[in-house]
UniProtKB/Swiss-Prot annotation:
Assigned keywords, A-Z: Acyltransferase, Cytoplasm, Iron, Metal-binding, Transferase, tRNA processing
UniProt lineage: Bacteria, Thermotogati, Thermotogota, Thermotogae, Thermotogales
Protein name as annotated: tRNA N6-adenosine threonylcarbamoyltransferase
Function, as annotated: Required for the formation of a threonylcarbamoyl group on adenosine at position 37 (t(6)A37) in tRNAs that read codons beginning with adenine. Is involved in the transfer of the threonylcarbamoyl moiety of threonylcarbamoyl-AMP (TC-AMP) to the N6 group of A37, together with TsaE and TsaB. TsaD likely plays a direct catalytic role in this reaction.
Cofactor note as given: Binds 1 Fe(2+) ion per subunit.
Designated gene of the protein: tsaD
Length: 327
């Protein structure tokens, strides 16, 4: 089964073709990071306009390598995300499905990120615990043996990625905050400053990062003699401590020995290092997608579309974009 995947939920325009849920035929992504850097974050209207510009170009490139008539299923993200951005990819996918007379599958963006880890690890079988951590989401999930997903914890305010972006802005480091803090923190001392770990001792599996961000703000207003590298490292350490502790606690309480980390923040080097240390110490199996599958991409959409199509779970052509779609 050949699936064409389209991703336009935020600021990456992506098109991919995947055969039988595992063989990559085409994979194109155009990032808008440089465009949004001057604004300090993603501007929804600007993102949508660039999707309109970039998507036809990527589809043309894809169909130069893959004859359109060989596509069996068309899949696209329909939520969650930015409504204008979502509509670009969703509308294109429906139009292609109609013109090619092929079935259409709407894909949940969060579920697609989870599928990225199965794409990268074909022999991986559930059940497993998954931490989805990105600029828009911080969720702890259980993937059941039938591949259904349950959200067991989530952020009550800012996502971890959003906290990275806001603290990077406070430190004058620019956008996007995750990669730049990761890079700058390598030169700093993560034990230099003690920032709070909100909800770390809470019995739930929920998160809160707004207070941590505010603590950094008050620190910067109060202190005059500090190194940006030390603040970045200490902030990053606080975030990583929260994410790692909550994730392993859930796995331990569920009796599950396999844990996956997906989403843009899963590319963070300190997170990966701390996770691997703890997994080795406590004998857990941990899985990360390769870096190129952590950020938004169309391969994960094609994979999710394949899994749904395999089960006959096609979508109606009147499916609408849902910016607040839940798992």
């Amino acid at each position: 089964m050949r699936v064409l995947g389209i991703e336009t939920s935020c600021d990456e325009t992506a098109v991919a073709v995947l055969d039988n849920g595992k063989n990559v035929v085409v994979n194109f992504t155009v990032s808008q990071i440089e465009i949004h850097q001057k604004f300090g974050g993603v501007v929804p209207e600007v993102a949508a306009r660039h999707h309109l510009k970039n998507l036809p170009i990527l589809l043309k490139k894809a169909f130069e390598k893959v004859p359109p008539e060989t596509v069996d299923v068309v899949a696209a993200t329909y939520g969650p995300g930015l409504i204008g951005a979502l509509l670009v990819g969703l509308s294109a996918a429906k139009g292609l499905a109609i013109s090619l007379e092929k079935p259409f599958v709407g894909v949940n963006h969060v579920e697609a990120h989870v599928q990225a880890v199965f794409l990268a690890n074909p022999d991986l079988k559930p059940p497993l615990v998954v931490l989805m951590v990105s600029g828009g989401h911080t969720q702890l999930m259980k993937v059941n043996e039938d591949y259904s997903m349950e959200v067991l914890g989530e952020t009550l305010d800012d996502s971890a990625g959003e906290a990275f972006d806001k603290v990077a802005r406070l430190l004058g480091l620019g956008y996007p905050g995750g990669p730049v803090i990761d890079r700058v923190a390598k030169k700093g001392d993560p034990e230099k400053y003690s920032f709070p770990r909100p909800m770390l001792d809470d019995d739930s599996y929920n998160f809160s990062f707004a207070g941590l961000k505010t603590s950094v703000l008050y620190f910067l207003q109060r202190e005059k003699d500090y190194k940006v590298e030390d603040v970045a490292a200490s902030f990053q350490k606080a975030v990583v401590d929260i994410l790692v502790e909550k994730t392993f606690r859930l796995a331990r309480n569920l009796g599950i020995r396999k844990i996956a980390f997906v989403g843009g923040v899963a590319a963070n080097s300190m997170l990966r290092e701390e996770v691997r240390k703890r997994a080795e110490r406590w004998n857990y199996e941990v899985f990360f997608p390769p870096l190129e599958l952590c950020t938004d991409n169309a391969l994960m959409v094609a994979k999710a579309g394949y899994e749904k199509a395999k089960r006959g779970m096609f979508s109606p052509l009147n499916l609408n974009a849902d910016p607040n779609l839940n798992v």
